[in-house]
């Protein structure tokens, strides 16, 4: 079915101004000469006025729309970062600057965050933690992004190195990271995007991953709050009409950045999927290829959709019951995986 929502495309360039027809020049020069003989302003001022009026303005560069937020942005390389979400790692740094913030279940029923940066990069971000086996398949939707992570068990490192991802771990590239801040180790590792991306100069630029942005669709259920229980931790989103976005909380505490800003997004996706044990038998493997139910939160309402991703290199689509693509609100998107 044809998609009626807005797809991220560049805007049209500025229209060129109309130039004064060449045949008017002799007339203007003649008038200028007459003006000079009668004591009027010098001919040069009249010519200058004509020249200013007839010069076309510079054509503006076509505006690019981020496929991750639906907002105007530069088309930059994609930087994916694994972010610590242990209680001792909070508050995190620069999650408010990400285009997409994801929340994943890890071992012990705890949660971890992944953040996607492309529209702009902060100076510092973190705390950075380890990667998981499912990240290799999950992040392929961004083609060949740079992946910043502290380290991982050897089997996961091997998978990352054999994949199209550009792994930039602390173990291999310590000069792109630093220890600091108020948190105790191991919750105090921070990365610098400029240095991280310098290690992955061929990282893919932002491209369509299946998100669509547009006006709020009809229907939906008015919703004030939605909680995802990960087992030993939980993530909650509360609608704020005042801020016109969903405010995030971790384990009942308001999620904030080290900048003091409250974290949250304009759109929240709660994607239900299977999470069998990975090859280690200890960590959930979040299935991001397949299909299932997803609840999309926007504008104070919950919309029931169906998510589908046919392969690791395919986009993830979110479809309403009538077959239309679910339009997201423009701005930061949060994606939370819930075990079904």
Q: What are these model-derived regions, one by one?
A:
Residues 55-100, 107-340:
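A surface/extracellular/periplasmic glyco- and lipid-processing/surface-interacting theme
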Residues 19-27, 45-49, 66:
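Intrinsically disordered, low-complexity segments used for protein-protein interactions
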Residues 1, 28-45:
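Sec-dependent N-terminal signal peptides
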Residues 2-4, 51:
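Interaction-prone helical segments in low-complexity regions
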Residues 6-9, 47-48, 68:
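Serine/proline-rich low-complexity intrinsically disordered segments, especially terminal tails, linkers
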Residues 4-32:
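N-terminal export and membrane-targeting signals
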Residues 39-61:
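C-terminal region of N-terminal signal peptides and the immediate post-cleavage residues
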